Protein backbone atom coordinates (compact mmCIF):
# COMPACT_ATOMS: atom_id res chain seq x y z
CA UNK A 1 0.00 0.00 0.00
CA UNK A 2 1.25 3.50 -0.84
CA UNK A 3 2.50 5.41 2.21
CA UNK A 4 0.18 8.36 1.58
CA UNK A 5 -2.79 5.93 1.57
CA UNK A 6 -1.80 4.76 5.06
CA UNK A 7 -1.63 8.37 6.20
CA UNK A 8 -5.07 9.13 4.73
CA UNK A 9 -6.57 6.01 6.31
CA UNK A 10 -5.24 7.04 9.71
CA UNK A 11 -7.17 10.31 9.62
CA UNK A 12 -10.34 9.04 7.90
CA UNK A 13 -13.47 9.92 9.93
CA UNK A 14 -15.73 7.55 11.88
CA UNK A 15 -18.76 9.03 10.14
CA UNK A 16 -21.11 8.15 7.28
CA UNK A 17 -20.31 9.34 3.78
CA UNK A 18 -19.05 8.47 0.32
CA UNK A 19 -15.56 7.53 -0.84
CA UNK A 20 -14.06 7.90 -4.32
CA UNK A 21 -11.25 5.54 -5.38
CA UNK A 22 -8.82 6.90 -8.00
CA UNK A 23 -6.20 5.37 -10.31
CA UNK A 24 -2.78 6.74 -11.27
CA UNK A 25 -4.35 9.13 -13.81
CA UNK A 26 -6.58 10.58 -11.10
CA UNK A 27 -9.65 9.02 -12.70
CA UNK A 28 -12.44 7.98 -10.34
CA UNK A 29 -12.73 4.21 -10.82
CA UNK A 30 -15.10 3.37 -7.96
CA UNK A 31 -17.59 5.19 -5.75
CA UNK A 32 -18.98 3.67 -2.56
CA UNK A 33 -20.83 4.65 0.59
CA UNK A 34 -20.42 3.63 4.20
CA UNK A 35 -21.95 4.11 7.62
CA UNK A 36 -18.39 4.38 8.98
CA UNK A 37 -15.97 5.66 6.33
CA UNK A 38 -12.76 4.67 8.12
CA UNK A 39 -13.79 1.02 8.54
CA UNK A 40 -15.08 0.60 5.02
CA UNK A 41 -12.11 2.18 3.23
CA UNK A 42 -9.62 0.28 5.40
CA UNK A 43 -11.34 -3.02 4.53
CA UNK A 44 -10.16 -2.69 0.91
CA UNK A 45 -6.51 -2.76 1.97
CA UNK A 46 -6.69 -5.49 4.63
CA UNK A 47 -7.76 -9.13 4.62
CA UNK A 48 -8.32 -11.40 1.63
CA UNK A 49 -10.44 -10.56 -1.42
CA UNK A 50 -11.73 -12.27 -4.53
CA UNK A 51 -10.11 -11.67 -7.93
CA UNK A 52 -12.34 -8.78 -8.97
CA UNK A 53 -11.78 -6.82 -5.77
CA UNK A 54 -8.04 -7.47 -5.98
CA UNK A 55 -8.05 -5.94 -9.49
CA UNK A 56 -9.85 -2.87 -8.16
CA UNK A 57 -7.49 -2.50 -5.19
CA UNK A 58 -4.49 -2.97 -7.49
CA UNK A 59 -5.49 0.15 -9.42
CA UNK A 60 -6.15 2.40 -6.41
CA UNK A 61 -3.41 4.98 -5.82
CA UNK A 62 -5.53 7.60 -4.07
CA UNK A 63 -8.95 8.17 -2.57
CA UNK A 64 -11.06 10.99 -1.24
CA UNK A 65 -14.20 11.03 0.84
CA UNK A 66 -17.23 13.19 1.46
CA UNK A 67 -18.77 13.12 4.92
CA UNK A 68 -22.58 13.20 5.12
CA UNK A 69 -24.96 13.71 8.01
CA UNK A 70 -26.72 10.34 7.58
CA UNK A 71 -26.66 7.04 5.75
CA UNK A 72 -29.65 8.21 3.67
CA UNK A 73 -27.75 11.31 2.55
CA UNK A 74 -24.77 9.07 1.66
CA UNK A 75 -27.00 6.85 -0.47
CA UNK A 76 -28.39 9.82 -2.42
CA UNK A 77 -24.91 11.31 -2.86
CA UNK A 78 -23.49 7.97 -4.04
CA UNK A 79 -26.04 7.73 -6.87
CA UNK A 80 -25.26 11.28 -7.98
CA UNK A 81 -21.50 10.63 -7.92
CA UNK A 82 -21.90 7.43 -9.97
CA UNK A 83 -23.90 9.37 -12.56
CA UNK A 84 -21.29 12.14 -12.59
CA UNK A 85 -18.12 10.03 -12.89
CA UNK A 86 -19.44 6.77 -14.43
CA UNK A 87 -16.70 4.75 -12.67
CA UNK A 88 -15.72 1.56 -14.47
CA UNK A 89 -16.09 -0.66 -11.38
CA UNK A 90 -19.57 0.57 -10.42
CA UNK A 91 -22.74 -0.98 -11.74
CA UNK A 92 -24.62 1.29 -14.11
CA UNK A 93 -28.08 -0.03 -14.87
CA UNK A 94 -28.93 0.70 -18.49
CA UNK A 95 -32.29 1.95 -19.71
CA UNK A 96 -32.44 -0.66 -22.47
CA UNK A 97 -34.90 -2.96 -20.74
CA UNK A 98 -38.35 -1.44 -21.15
CA UNK A 99 -41.77 -2.98 -20.77
CA UNK A 100 -44.90 -2.29 -22.83
CA UNK A 101 -47.75 -0.16 -21.49
CA UNK A 102 -51.27 0.38 -22.79
CA UNK A 103 -51.94 4.08 -23.25
CA UNK A 104 -55.19 6.02 -23.62
CA UNK A 105 -54.22 9.20 -25.43
CA UNK A 106 -55.37 12.63 -24.27
CA UNK A 107 -56.52 13.63 -27.78
CA UNK A 108 -59.96 15.07 -28.45
CA UNK A 109 -60.83 11.72 -30.03
CA UNK A 110 -58.74 9.38 -27.85
CA UNK A 111 -57.03 6.21 -29.04
CA UNK A 112 -55.64 3.06 -27.45
CA UNK A 113 -51.91 2.53 -28.08
CA UNK A 114 -49.12 0.24 -26.97
CA UNK A 115 -45.96 2.10 -26.03
CA UNK A 116 -42.68 1.53 -24.21
CA UNK A 117 -42.08 5.26 -23.67
CA UNK A 118 -43.96 6.77 -20.77
CA UNK A 119 -44.26 10.55 -21.13
CA UNK A 120 -45.84 13.35 -19.11
CA UNK A 121 -48.39 14.13 -21.81
CA UNK A 122 -51.71 13.81 -19.92
CA UNK A 123 -52.23 10.35 -21.43
CA UNK A 124 -53.27 7.49 -19.15
CA UNK A 125 -50.80 4.58 -18.90
CA UNK A 126 -51.51 1.04 -17.70
CA UNK A 127 -48.88 -1.62 -17.07
CA UNK A 128 -46.18 -2.64 -17.33
CA UNK A 129 -47.15 -5.80 -19.19
CA UNK A 130 -44.81 -8.79 -19.04
CA UNK A 131 -44.25 -8.82 -22.79
CA UNK A 132 -45.51 -7.36 -26.04
CA UNK A 133 -47.81 -10.31 -26.73
CA UNK A 134 -49.66 -9.86 -23.44
CA UNK A 135 -50.12 -6.13 -24.10
CA UNK A 136 -51.30 -6.71 -27.69
CA UNK A 137 -53.79 -9.40 -26.63
CA UNK A 138 -55.29 -7.09 -24.01
CA UNK A 139 -55.46 -4.15 -26.45
CA UNK A 140 -57.07 -6.36 -29.10
CA UNK A 141 -59.76 -7.36 -26.60
CA UNK A 142 -60.37 -3.71 -25.62
CA UNK A 143 -60.56 -2.71 -29.30
CA UNK A 144 -63.31 -5.27 -29.82
CA UNK A 145 -65.27 -4.16 -26.77
CA UNK A 146 -64.86 -0.37 -26.79
CA UNK A 147 -65.22 1.65 -30.04
CA UNK A 148 -62.52 4.32 -29.69
CA UNK A 149 -61.01 5.59 -32.94
CA UNK A 150 -58.27 3.44 -34.44
CA UNK A 151 -56.79 5.61 -37.21
CA UNK A 152 -53.69 7.74 -36.54
CA UNK A 153 -54.88 10.41 -38.97
CA UNK A 154 -58.55 11.18 -39.58
CA UNK A 155 -59.57 9.67 -42.96
CA UNK A 156 -62.17 11.18 -45.32
CA UNK A 157 -64.52 8.22 -45.06
CA UNK A 158 -65.43 5.49 -42.61
CA UNK A 159 -63.08 2.51 -42.38
CA UNK A 160 -63.55 -1.20 -41.78
CA UNK A 161 -63.50 -0.78 -37.99
CA UNK A 162 -66.74 1.22 -38.17
CA UNK A 163 -68.47 -1.54 -40.13
CA UNK A 164 -67.20 -4.08 -37.56
CA UNK A 165 -68.68 -2.00 -34.72
CA UNK A 166 -65.24 -1.21 -33.27
CA UNK A 167 -65.22 2.55 -34.02
CA UNK A 168 -67.78 5.37 -33.79
CA UNK A 169 -66.31 7.00 -36.93
CA UNK A 170 -65.45 10.48 -35.58
CA UNK A 171 -63.95 11.12 -39.03
CA UNK A 172 -67.44 11.64 -40.50
CA UNK A 173 -69.80 11.66 -37.51
CA UNK A 174 -70.00 13.78 -34.41
CA UNK A 175 -68.75 11.90 -31.35
CA UNK A 176 -69.28 13.96 -28.20
CA UNK A 177 -66.87 14.38 -25.32
CA UNK A 178 -69.41 12.62 -23.07
CA UNK A 179 -69.47 9.56 -25.36
CA UNK A 180 -65.69 9.32 -25.35
CA UNK A 181 -65.53 9.83 -21.57
CA UNK A 182 -68.00 7.00 -21.01
CA UNK A 183 -65.91 4.63 -23.16
CA UNK A 184 -62.63 5.72 -21.55
CA UNK A 185 -64.07 5.24 -18.04
CA UNK A 186 -65.11 1.70 -18.97
CA UNK A 187 -61.62 0.91 -20.26
CA UNK A 188 -60.03 2.36 -17.12
CA UNK A 189 -62.35 0.28 -14.95
CA UNK A 190 -61.41 -2.85 -16.88
CA UNK A 191 -57.65 -2.19 -16.72
CA UNK A 192 -57.80 -1.34 -13.02
CA UNK A 193 -58.99 -4.82 -12.14
CA UNK A 194 -62.69 -4.51 -12.90
CA UNK A 195 -62.75 -7.21 -15.57
CA UNK A 196 -64.99 -9.45 -13.45
CA UNK A 197 -67.60 -6.72 -13.24
CA UNK A 198 -67.32 -6.09 -16.99
CA UNK A 199 -67.64 -9.82 -17.64
CA UNK A 200 -70.82 -10.01 -15.52
CA UNK A 201 -72.34 -7.07 -17.39
CA UNK A 202 -71.55 -8.70 -20.74
CA UNK A 203 -73.07 -11.96 -19.54
CA UNK A 204 -76.32 -10.19 -18.62
CA UNK A 205 -76.40 -8.46 -22.02
CA UNK A 206 -75.76 -11.80 -23.75
CA UNK A 207 -78.77 -13.44 -22.05
CA UNK A 208 -80.94 -10.41 -22.82
CA UNK A 209 -79.96 -10.54 -26.51
CA UNK A 210 -80.67 -14.26 -26.59
CA UNK A 211 -84.15 -13.77 -25.10
CA UNK A 212 -84.86 -11.14 -27.77
CA UNK A 213 -83.74 -13.67 -30.40
CA UNK A 214 -80.80 -11.39 -31.33
CA UNK A 215 -78.53 -14.37 -31.81
CA UNK A 216 -75.78 -12.58 -33.76
CA UNK A 217 -75.44 -10.02 -30.97
CA UNK A 218 -75.52 -12.78 -28.34
CA UNK A 219 -72.73 -14.61 -30.18
CA UNK A 220 -70.59 -11.43 -30.30
CA UNK A 221 -71.03 -10.96 -26.55
CA UNK A 222 -70.25 -14.63 -25.90
CA UNK A 223 -67.02 -14.29 -27.90
CA UNK A 224 -66.03 -11.19 -25.91
CA UNK A 225 -66.57 -13.09 -22.65
CA UNK A 226 -64.44 -15.96 -23.97
CA UNK A 227 -61.64 -13.51 -24.85
CA UNK A 228 -61.75 -12.00 -21.35
CA UNK A 229 -61.56 -15.48 -19.79
CA UNK A 230 -58.65 -16.48 -22.04
CA UNK A 231 -56.57 -13.39 -21.23
CA UNK A 232 -57.31 -13.32 -17.51
CA UNK A 233 -56.53 -17.03 -17.21
CA UNK A 234 -52.91 -16.09 -18.01
CA UNK A 235 -52.83 -13.58 -15.15
CA UNK A 236 -53.66 -15.63 -12.06
CA UNK A 237 -54.30 -13.75 -8.83
CA UNK A 238 -51.65 -14.20 -6.14
CA UNK A 239 -52.64 -11.35 -3.78
CA UNK A 240 -56.22 -10.51 -2.88
CA UNK A 241 -55.71 -6.84 -1.88
CA UNK A 242 -55.03 -5.69 -5.51
CA UNK A 243 -52.15 -3.43 -4.34
CA UNK A 244 -49.40 -2.68 -6.89
CA UNK A 245 -46.08 -3.75 -5.35
CA UNK A 246 -42.54 -4.69 -6.32
CA UNK A 247 -41.04 -7.61 -4.39
CA UNK A 248 -37.24 -7.78 -4.17
CA UNK A 249 -34.94 -10.69 -3.44
CA UNK A 250 -31.21 -11.19 -3.89
CA UNK A 251 -28.34 -13.64 -3.58
CA UNK A 252 -24.56 -13.21 -3.48
CA UNK A 253 -21.88 -15.71 -4.53
CA UNK A 254 -18.27 -15.55 -5.75
CA UNK A 255 -18.24 -11.74 -5.74
CA UNK A 256 -21.43 -11.44 -7.82
CA UNK A 257 -24.90 -10.28 -6.84
CA UNK A 258 -28.18 -11.23 -8.49
CA UNK A 259 -31.29 -9.17 -7.73
CA UNK A 260 -34.72 -10.41 -8.76
CA UNK A 261 -37.76 -8.12 -8.79
CA UNK A 262 -41.30 -9.48 -8.99
CA UNK A 263 -43.81 -6.99 -10.39
CA UNK A 264 -47.20 -7.56 -8.76
CA UNK A 265 -49.97 -5.51 -10.39
CA UNK A 266 -53.61 -5.63 -9.27
CA UNK A 267 -52.82 -8.78 -7.31
CA UNK A 268 -51.17 -10.57 -10.24
CA UNK A 269 -47.51 -11.47 -10.66
CA UNK A 270 -47.06 -10.17 -14.21
CA UNK A 271 -43.28 -10.13 -14.71
CA UNK A 272 -39.88 -10.30 -13.11
CA UNK A 273 -36.65 -8.40 -13.68
CA UNK A 274 -33.27 -10.12 -13.29
CA UNK A 275 -30.03 -8.17 -12.85
CA UNK A 276 -26.55 -9.62 -12.26
CA UNK A 277 -23.41 -7.61 -11.52
CA UNK A 278 -20.07 -7.79 -9.66
CA UNK A 279 -20.14 -6.42 -6.12
CA UNK A 280 -17.32 -4.79 -4.17
CA UNK A 281 -19.30 -3.67 -1.09
CA UNK A 282 -21.27 -5.45 1.58
CA UNK A 283 -24.39 -7.07 0.04
CA UNK A 284 -26.77 -4.70 1.83
CA UNK A 285 -24.90 -1.66 0.50
CA UNK A 286 -24.82 -3.11 -3.01
CA UNK A 287 -28.56 -3.76 -2.87
CA UNK A 288 -29.34 -0.19 -1.79
CA UNK A 289 -27.25 1.19 -4.66
CA UNK A 290 -29.09 -1.11 -7.07
CA UNK A 291 -32.57 -0.15 -5.89
CA UNK A 292 -31.75 3.55 -6.19
CA UNK A 293 -30.64 3.14 -9.81
CA UNK A 294 -33.54 0.78 -10.54
CA UNK A 295 -36.18 3.46 -9.99
CA UNK A 296 -34.20 6.09 -11.88
CA UNK A 297 -34.92 4.03 -15.00
CA UNK A 298 -37.87 5.68 -16.75
CA UNK A 299 -39.54 2.32 -17.44
CA UNK A 300 -39.78 1.47 -13.72
CA UNK A 301 -42.69 3.19 -11.99
CA UNK A 302 -42.60 3.33 -8.22
CA UNK A 303 -45.51 1.16 -7.05
CA UNK A 304 -47.59 1.76 -3.96
CA UNK A 305 -45.45 -0.65 -1.93
CA UNK A 306 -41.93 -2.08 -2.10
CA UNK A 307 -41.22 -5.37 -0.33
CA UNK A 308 -37.58 -6.03 0.65
CA UNK A 309 -35.68 -8.91 2.33
CA UNK A 310 -35.15 -8.95 6.09
CA UNK A 311 -31.47 -7.97 5.86
CA UNK A 312 -32.32 -4.59 4.27
CA UNK A 313 -33.09 -1.40 6.20
CA UNK A 314 -36.69 -0.88 5.06
CA UNK A 315 -36.98 2.49 6.85
CA UNK A 316 -33.99 3.79 4.87
CA UNK A 317 -35.52 2.50 1.62
CA UNK A 318 -38.83 4.17 2.49
CA UNK A 319 -37.25 7.54 3.23
CA UNK A 320 -34.97 7.33 0.20
CA UNK A 321 -37.62 6.35 -2.37
CA UNK A 322 -40.56 8.07 -0.64
CA UNK A 323 -42.63 4.91 -1.07
CA UNK A 324 -43.99 2.53 1.55
CA UNK A 325 -41.38 -0.20 2.12
CA UNK A 326 -42.15 -3.34 4.11
CA UNK A 327 -40.10 -6.19 5.51
CA UNK A 328 -42.56 -9.07 5.96
CA UNK A 329 -42.09 -11.55 8.79
CA UNK A 330 -44.78 -14.01 7.66
CA UNK A 331 -47.54 -14.57 5.14
CA UNK A 332 -47.78 -14.29 1.37
CA UNK A 333 -45.40 -11.32 1.06
CA UNK A 334 -42.67 -13.19 2.93
CA UNK A 335 -43.25 -16.20 0.67
CA UNK A 336 -42.75 -13.97 -2.38
CA UNK A 337 -39.52 -12.49 -0.97
CA UNK A 338 -38.20 -15.99 -0.30
CA UNK A 339 -39.20 -17.02 -3.82
CA UNK A 340 -37.32 -14.02 -5.26
CA UNK A 341 -34.28 -14.92 -3.11
CA UNK A 342 -34.47 -18.52 -4.29
CA UNK A 343 -34.69 -17.47 -7.95
CA UNK A 344 -31.68 -15.17 -7.50
CA UNK A 345 -29.65 -18.01 -5.94
CA UNK A 346 -30.59 -20.37 -8.79
CA UNK A 347 -29.69 -17.73 -11.41
CA UNK A 348 -26.19 -17.34 -9.91
CA UNK A 349 -25.70 -21.10 -9.74
CA UNK A 350 -26.67 -21.38 -13.42
CA UNK A 351 -24.28 -18.55 -14.34
CA UNK A 352 -21.29 -20.23 -12.69
CA UNK A 353 -22.25 -23.65 -14.02
CA UNK A 354 -22.34 -22.31 -17.59
CA UNK A 355 -19.01 -20.51 -17.11
CA UNK A 356 -17.38 -23.68 -15.77
CA UNK A 357 -18.91 -25.78 -18.56
CA UNK A 358 -17.71 -23.37 -21.26
CA UNK A 359 -14.23 -23.25 -19.74
CA UNK A 360 -14.11 -27.04 -19.63
CA UNK A 361 -15.20 -27.28 -23.28
CA UNK A 362 -12.70 -24.62 -24.35
CA UNK A 363 -9.78 -26.28 -22.56
CA UNK A 364 -10.73 -29.64 -24.11
CA UNK A 365 -10.88 -28.00 -27.55
CA UNK A 366 -7.35 -26.62 -27.12
CA UNK A 367 -6.08 -30.00 -25.93
CA UNK A 368 -7.78 -31.88 -28.79
CA UNK A 369 -6.42 -29.40 -31.34
CA UNK A 370 -2.89 -30.12 -30.11
CA UNK A 371 -3.44 -33.87 -30.41
CA UNK A 372 -4.84 -33.52 -33.94
CA UNK A 373 -1.75 -31.55 -34.98
CA UNK A 374 0.65 -33.85 -33.12
CA UNK A 375 1.99 -31.10 -30.84
CA UNK A 376 1.86 -30.20 -27.16
CA UNK A 377 -1.33 -28.50 -25.95
CA UNK A 378 -1.25 -25.00 -27.54
CA UNK A 379 -2.28 -22.91 -24.53
CA UNK A 380 -1.19 -19.74 -26.33
CA UNK A 381 -2.13 -19.42 -30.01
CA UNK A 382 -1.18 -16.44 -32.18
CA UNK A 383 -2.84 -15.93 -35.58
CA UNK A 384 -1.93 -13.61 -38.48
CA UNK A 385 -3.95 -12.22 -41.39
CA UNK A 386 -3.17 -9.68 -44.11
CA UNK A 387 -5.61 -7.15 -45.53
CA UNK A 388 -5.44 -4.88 -48.57
CA UNK A 389 -7.87 -3.65 -51.19
CA UNK A 390 -6.45 -3.20 -54.70
CA UNK A 391 -2.99 -2.98 -53.17
CA UNK A 392 -3.72 0.14 -51.10
CA UNK A 393 -2.85 0.55 -47.43
CA UNK A 394 -1.62 -3.04 -46.91
CA UNK A 395 -1.84 -4.05 -43.26
CA UNK A 396 -1.54 -7.15 -41.15
CA UNK A 397 -2.99 -8.11 -37.81
CA UNK A 398 -2.07 -10.55 -35.08
CA UNK A 399 -4.43 -11.83 -32.42
CA UNK A 400 -3.76 -14.08 -29.43
CA UNK A 401 -5.94 -16.76 -27.86
CA UNK A 402 -4.91 -17.93 -24.39
CA UNK A 403 -6.57 -21.09 -23.05
CA UNK A 404 -8.95 -20.92 -25.99
CA UNK A 405 -10.15 -17.37 -25.30
CA UNK A 406 -9.28 -14.09 -27.03
CA UNK A 407 -6.65 -12.09 -25.12
CA UNK A 408 -7.35 -8.66 -26.60
CA UNK A 409 -4.56 -6.88 -24.74
CA UNK A 410 -2.13 -9.05 -26.73
CA UNK A 411 -3.52 -8.06 -30.15
CA UNK A 412 -1.17 -6.20 -32.51
CA UNK A 413 -1.70 -4.14 -35.70
CA UNK A 414 0.95 -3.62 -38.39
CA UNK A 415 1.27 -1.19 -41.28
CA UNK A 416 3.30 -2.87 -44.02
CA UNK A 417 6.46 -0.78 -44.47
CA UNK A 418 8.91 -2.62 -46.74
CA UNK A 419 6.64 -4.13 -49.39
CA UNK A 420 5.56 -2.29 -52.51
CA UNK A 421 2.19 -3.28 -53.96
CA UNK A 422 -0.02 -6.24 -53.08
CA UNK A 423 2.43 -9.03 -52.15
CA UNK A 424 0.85 -11.22 -49.48
CA UNK A 425 3.88 -13.48 -49.02
CA UNK A 426 6.38 -10.67 -48.50
CA UNK A 427 3.91 -8.89 -46.23
CA UNK A 428 3.67 -12.04 -44.12
CA UNK A 429 7.47 -12.29 -43.96
CA UNK A 430 7.75 -8.68 -42.77
CA UNK A 431 5.11 -9.01 -40.07
CA UNK A 432 6.38 -12.32 -38.67
CA UNK A 433 9.90 -10.86 -38.58
CA UNK A 434 8.73 -7.72 -36.74
CA UNK A 435 6.53 -9.58 -34.29
CA UNK A 436 9.05 -12.18 -33.11
CA UNK A 437 12.16 -10.01 -33.32
CA UNK A 438 10.47 -7.73 -30.81
CA UNK A 439 9.23 -10.65 -28.71
CA UNK A 440 12.80 -11.97 -28.41
CA UNK A 441 14.17 -8.51 -27.64
CA UNK A 442 11.58 -7.87 -24.90
CA UNK A 443 11.62 -11.47 -23.65
CA UNK A 444 7.84 -11.66 -24.21
CA UNK A 445 5.93 -14.96 -24.03
CA UNK A 446 6.13 -16.97 -27.24
CA UNK A 447 3.15 -18.90 -28.60
CA UNK A 448 2.72 -22.67 -28.52
CA UNK A 449 1.15 -22.52 -31.99
CA UNK A 450 1.17 -19.95 -34.79
CA UNK A 451 -1.73 -19.95 -37.24
CA UNK A 452 -1.32 -18.25 -40.60
CA UNK A 453 -4.55 -17.38 -42.39
CA UNK A 454 -3.51 -18.67 -45.81
CA UNK A 455 -2.17 -21.59 -47.83
CA UNK A 456 1.22 -23.18 -48.56
CA UNK A 457 2.87 -20.00 -49.83
CA UNK A 458 1.96 -18.00 -46.73
CA UNK A 459 3.09 -20.85 -44.47
CA UNK A 460 6.43 -21.21 -46.29
CA UNK A 461 7.11 -17.46 -46.08
CA UNK A 462 6.38 -17.30 -42.35
CA UNK A 463 8.34 -20.51 -41.57
CA UNK A 464 11.39 -19.24 -43.44
CA UNK A 465 11.59 -16.08 -41.32
CA UNK A 466 10.87 -17.88 -38.07
CA UNK A 467 13.37 -20.71 -38.47
CA UNK A 468 16.10 -19.46 -40.82
CA UNK A 469 16.32 -15.83 -39.65
CA UNK A 470 15.25 -15.96 -36.01
CA UNK A 471 16.14 -19.53 -35.09
CA UNK A 472 12.72 -20.19 -33.58
CA UNK A 473 11.04 -23.57 -33.92
CA UNK A 474 7.40 -22.99 -33.01
CA UNK A 475 4.65 -25.21 -34.47
CA UNK A 476 3.00 -23.35 -37.33
CA UNK A 477 -0.16 -24.20 -39.27
CA UNK A 478 -1.88 -22.66 -42.26
CA UNK A 479 -5.62 -22.09 -42.09
CA UNK A 480 -7.12 -22.96 -45.47
CA UNK A 481 -10.55 -21.68 -46.58
CA UNK A 482 -13.03 -23.36 -48.91
CA UNK A 483 -14.49 -21.80 -52.08
CA UNK A 484 -17.04 -19.96 -49.91
CA UNK A 485 -14.22 -18.35 -47.89
CA UNK A 486 -15.15 -20.42 -44.82
CA UNK A 487 -12.80 -22.40 -42.57
CA UNK A 488 -11.95 -25.69 -44.30
CA UNK A 489 -8.89 -27.35 -42.75
CA UNK A 490 -5.35 -26.86 -41.46
CA UNK A 491 -2.05 -27.63 -43.14
CA UNK A 492 1.10 -28.34 -41.14
CA UNK A 493 4.61 -29.70 -41.64
CA UNK A 494 7.25 -29.60 -44.37
CA UNK A 495 5.95 -30.36 -46.90
CA UNK A 496 2.55 -29.18 -45.60
CA UNK A 497 0.01 -31.95 -45.07
CA UNK A 498 -3.73 -31.34 -44.58
CA UNK A 499 -5.28 -31.97 -41.16
CA UNK A 500 -9.02 -32.45 -41.45
CA UNK A 501 -11.12 -31.74 -38.34
CA UNK A 502 -14.65 -32.87 -37.59
CA UNK A 503 -16.83 -29.90 -38.57
CA UNK A 504 -19.01 -30.27 -35.47
CA UNK A 505 -16.09 -30.63 -33.06
CA UNK A 506 -15.15 -28.05 -30.43
CA UNK A 507 -11.66 -27.69 -31.93
CA UNK A 508 -13.16 -26.81 -35.33
CA UNK A 509 -15.39 -24.17 -33.69
CA UNK A 510 -12.28 -22.80 -31.96
CA UNK A 511 -10.51 -22.45 -35.32
CA UNK A 512 -13.56 -20.70 -36.79
CA UNK A 513 -13.54 -18.20 -33.92
CA UNK A 514 -9.83 -17.56 -34.41
CA UNK A 515 -10.21 -17.09 -38.17
CA UNK A 516 -13.23 -14.80 -37.83
CA UNK A 517 -11.55 -12.74 -35.12
CA UNK A 518 -8.22 -12.19 -36.90
CA UNK A 519 -10.05 -11.32 -40.14
CA UNK A 520 -12.32 -8.86 -38.30
CA UNK A 521 -9.37 -7.23 -36.56
CA UNK A 522 -7.35 -6.90 -39.79
CA UNK A 523 -10.18 -5.59 -41.95
CA UNK A 524 -11.25 -3.05 -39.30
CA UNK A 525 -7.71 -1.67 -39.13
CA UNK A 526 -7.47 -1.55 -42.92
CA UNK A 527 -10.75 0.35 -43.26
CA UNK A 528 -9.58 2.91 -40.71
CA UNK A 529 -6.39 3.56 -42.68
CA UNK A 530 -8.14 3.50 -46.04
CA UNK A 531 -10.71 6.04 -44.84
CA UNK A 532 -7.95 8.36 -43.65
CA UNK A 533 -6.01 8.10 -46.91
CA UNK A 534 -9.11 8.82 -49.01
CA UNK A 535 -9.73 12.01 -47.04
CA UNK A 536 -6.10 13.07 -47.17
CA UNK A 537 -5.77 12.49 -50.94
CA UNK A 538 -9.01 14.39 -51.54
CA UNK A 539 -7.54 17.37 -49.68
CA UNK A 540 -4.13 17.29 -51.37
CA UNK A 541 -5.03 19.84 -54.08
CA UNK A 542 -6.73 22.38 -51.82
CA UNK A 543 -4.60 25.52 -51.29
CA UNK A 544 -3.75 26.20 -47.66
CA UNK A 545 -4.27 22.60 -46.48
CA UNK A 546 -1.13 20.95 -45.19
CA UNK A 547 -0.62 17.79 -43.12
CA UNK A 548 -1.51 19.51 -39.86
CA UNK A 549 -4.87 20.81 -41.12
CA UNK A 550 -5.62 17.46 -42.78
CA UNK A 551 -5.26 15.76 -39.40
CA UNK A 552 -7.50 18.37 -37.75
CA UNK A 553 -10.21 17.90 -40.40
CA UNK A 554 -9.93 14.12 -40.24
CA UNK A 555 -10.30 14.12 -36.47
CA UNK A 556 -13.23 16.56 -36.52
CA UNK A 557 -15.32 15.13 -39.38
CA UNK A 558 -14.18 11.51 -39.56
CA UNK A 559 -15.20 10.98 -43.20
CA UNK A 560 -15.14 12.68 -46.58
CA UNK A 561 -18.91 12.32 -46.84
CA UNK A 562 -19.41 14.45 -43.72
CA UNK A 563 -16.99 17.06 -45.03
CA UNK A 564 -18.88 17.33 -48.31
CA UNK A 565 -22.10 17.88 -46.34
CA UNK A 566 -20.56 20.51 -44.02
CA UNK A 567 -21.15 24.26 -44.22
CA UNK A 568 -18.52 27.00 -44.14
CA UNK A 569 -19.44 27.68 -40.50
CA UNK A 570 -18.78 24.04 -39.60
CA UNK A 571 -15.30 24.21 -41.14
CA UNK A 572 -14.65 27.34 -39.06
CA UNK A 573 -15.85 25.45 -35.95
CA UNK A 574 -13.31 22.74 -36.83
CA UNK A 575 -10.54 25.34 -36.47
CA UNK A 576 -10.12 26.54 -40.06
CA UNK A 577 -9.66 30.28 -40.79
CA UNK A 578 -12.66 31.80 -42.59
CA UNK A 579 -10.88 32.13 -45.96
CA UNK A 580 -9.58 28.53 -45.79
CA UNK A 581 -13.05 27.28 -44.78
CA UNK A 582 -14.52 29.00 -47.85
CA UNK A 583 -11.83 27.44 -50.09
CA UNK A 584 -12.49 23.93 -48.72
CA UNK A 585 -16.24 24.36 -49.09
CA UNK A 586 -15.95 25.60 -52.69
CA UNK A 587 -13.51 22.86 -53.67
CA UNK A 588 -15.54 19.98 -52.18
CA UNK A 589 -18.88 21.19 -53.53
CA UNK A 590 -17.37 21.61 -57.02
CA UNK A 591 -15.80 18.14 -57.00
CA UNK A 592 -19.00 16.15 -57.39
CA UNK A 593 -17.12 13.04 -58.40
CA UNK A 594 -15.09 12.80 -55.22
From Swiss-Prot:
Q: Which GO terms describe its biological process?
A: DNA damage response; nucleotide-excision repair; SOS response
List the GO terms this entry assigns under cellular component, sorted alphabetically. cytoplasm; excinuclease repair complex
Q: Which superkingdom is the protein from?
A: Bacteria
| Pfam families in the cross-refs | GIY-YIG, UVR, UvrC_RNaseH, UvrC_RNaseH_dom
Location in the cell reads: Cytoplasm
Q: Which residues form the UVR domain?
A: 196-231
Record domain GIY-YIG: where: 14-91
Q: Which UniProt keywords apply?
A: Cytoplasm, DNA damage, DNA excision, DNA repair, Excision nuclease, SOS response
Report the principal subcellular site.
Answer: cytoplasm
Give the protein's biological function. The UvrABC repair system catalyzes the recognition and processing of DNA lesions. UvrC both incises the 5' and 3' sides of the lesion. The N-terminal half is responsible for the 3' incision and the C-terminal half is responsible for the 5' incision.
Please give the family membership noted in the entry: Belongs to the UvrC family.
Question: What is the name of this protein?
Answer: UvrABC system protein C
Amino acid sequence: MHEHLKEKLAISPDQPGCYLMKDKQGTVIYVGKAKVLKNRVRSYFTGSHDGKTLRLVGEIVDFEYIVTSSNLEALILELNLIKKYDPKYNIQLKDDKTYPFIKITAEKQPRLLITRNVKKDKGKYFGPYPNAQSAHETKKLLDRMYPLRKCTNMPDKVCLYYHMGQCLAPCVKEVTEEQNKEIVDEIIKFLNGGHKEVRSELEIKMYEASEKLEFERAKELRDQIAHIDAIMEKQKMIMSDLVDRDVFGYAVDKGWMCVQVFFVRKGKLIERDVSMFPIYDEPEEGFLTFIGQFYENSSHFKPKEIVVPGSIDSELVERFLEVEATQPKRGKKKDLVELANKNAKIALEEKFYLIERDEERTIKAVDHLGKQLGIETPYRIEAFDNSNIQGTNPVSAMIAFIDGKPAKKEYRKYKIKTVQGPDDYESMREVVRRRYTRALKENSPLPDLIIIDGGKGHLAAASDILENELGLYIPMAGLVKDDKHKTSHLIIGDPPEPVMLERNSQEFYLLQRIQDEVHRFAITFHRQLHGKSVIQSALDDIPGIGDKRKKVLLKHFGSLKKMKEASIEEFVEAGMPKNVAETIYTYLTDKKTL
